[in-house]
Amino acid sequence: MSTLCLPHVMFPQHKITQQQMVDHLENLHADHPRMALAKRMIANTEVNERHLVLPIDELAVHTGFTHRSIVYEREARQMSSAAARQAIENAGLQISDIRMVIVTSCTGFMMPSLTAHLINDLALPTSTVQLPIAQLGCVAGAAAINRANDFARLDARNHVLIVSLEFSSLCYQPDDTKLHAFISAALFGDAVSACVLRADDQAGGFKIKKTESYFLPKSEHYIKYDVKDTGFHFTLDKAVMNSIKDVAPVMERLNYESFEQNCAHNDFFIFHTGGRKILDELVMHLDLASNRVSQSRSSLSEAGNIASVVVFDVLKRQFDSNLNRGDIGLLAAFGPGFTAEMAVGEWTA
């Protein structure tokens, strides 16, 4: 069975508190008739601070999709390479040991993919398999883990480098006055992570036993982008907040088939931080105590929703916690489609 090793997570230098973001929105849209409601909804996100690739004052003046794409590529190249080198070292491997590289990102576009940059910059083997994932949004990190696991199961030498990179602030639309635009502007944060999935049993971490994918039919409108001249405009249907009830039975079945116990008896969880409501729904439908998802809540509070990076940030927090060898855990993330990707396994660190 393959093992997720200690990730390396990086944040851009610019930081913004939630109060600063509220003040910014109030100044920008002083006469908005629903600003009081927006402020209450932003307070309910339970996000305290986030990191941004540019200061909020620069983001408040939309300089065009071209300029934002230049910033995206510049920061992506620099931060991804640094994170990747540290992740490979964390896994106890050499660069030449990597046989596949996966990059997840839904907040910018590059062609060739960032996978090509990493092969060149790190001097990965020329036979390295590339898998860029661009349109799975927040679920992409977990999807990358599961696709890496599929590849690793073919050969005990098939070690995989996964790099997740999200600069959601570059999708901020200061002229968008829709209520959900205000909420997303205060919810999503910027971050980069790199993590190695080792195909052998020679490292400690989250050893994957079984994975599962789930697609909710006729839910494409739940989470989507409207692509306009100014770039990506994020839209969210409130129906997504009730989607966990559909995927919870799938998680329970996966868990029981793997360990003959319900999720409530697991020792740890690595959940995507879609927002406070999503975490509350997981607690309710999996019959968990609220503190069982404390690592995800901490990630949400300290970094915001960092999309495909979330599962790796929460995984890193589990490495810093007091888990014991043999503890059983569930990893799950959710995104456009509506899509869920899940993995269950044991702690071996």
UniProtKB/Swiss-Prot annotation:
Active-site residues per Swiss-Prot or TrEMBL entry:
C138
Kindly indicate whether the keyword Secreted belongs to this entry: no
Which superkingdom does the taxonomy of this entry point to? Bacteria
List the keywords (alphabetical).
Answer: Acyltransferase, Antibiotic biosynthesis, Transferase
Instruction: Return one GO MF term.
Output: acyltransferase activity, transferring groups other than amino-acyl groups
Q: Which GO terms describe its biological process?
A: antibiotic biosynthetic process; polyketide biosynthetic process
Asked whether the UniProt record includes Transferase among its keywords, one would answer yes
Which GO cellular component terms, listed alphabetically, does the Swiss-Prot or TrEMBL entry include? type III polyketide synthase complex
Which Pfam family, just one, is annotated for this protein? Answer: Chal_sti_synt_N
Q: In which pathway does it act?
A: Antibiotic biosynthesis
User: Known consequence of changing M21T?
Assistant: No change in activity toward lauroyl-CoA. 3.8-fold improvement in thermostability. Shows 90% of wild type specific activity
Catalytic reaction equation(s): 3 malonyl-CoA + 3 H(+) = 1,3,5-trihydroxybenzene + 3 CO2 + 3 CoA
Taking the record's annotation, the residue ranges forming a coiled coil are none
Q: Tell me the impact of changing A185D.
A: Loss of activity
| Outcome of swapping H24L | Shows reduced activity toward lauroyl-CoA and decrease in phloroglucinol production
Q: How is it used?
A: Phloroglucinol is widely used in industry and in the synthesis of pharmaceuticals. PhlD can be used to produce this chemical, however it exhibits low productivity, which is a bottleneck for large-scale application. Different stategies have been developed to improve the stability and the productivity of the enzyme.
UniProt cross-references to InterPro entries, sorted A to Z: Chalcone/stilbene_synt_C, Chalcone/stilbene_synt_N, Polyketide_synthase_type-III, Thiolase-like
The EC number of this protein is 2.3.1.253
- Reported effect of changing Y256R? 2-fold increase in catalytic efficiency
Q: Which EC class, in a word?
A: transferase
Q: Which family does it belong to?
A: Belongs to the thiolase-like superfamily. Chalcone/stilbene synthases family.
What does the record give as the function of this protein? Type III polyketide synthase that catalyzes the synthesis of phloroglucinol from three molecules of malonyl-CoA. In addition to its ability to produce phloroglucinol from malonyl-CoA, it exhibits broad substrate specificity, accepting C4-C12 aliphatic acyl-CoAs and phenylacetyl-CoA as the starters to form C6-polyoxoalkylated alpha-pyrones from sequential condensation with malonyl-CoA.
Q: Which PANTHER family match?
A: 1,3,6,8-TETRAHYDROXYNAPHTHALENE SYNTHASE (PTHR11877:SF99), HYDROXYMETHYLGLUTARYL-COA SYNTHASE (PTHR11877)
What's the protein name?
Answer: Phloroglucinol synthase
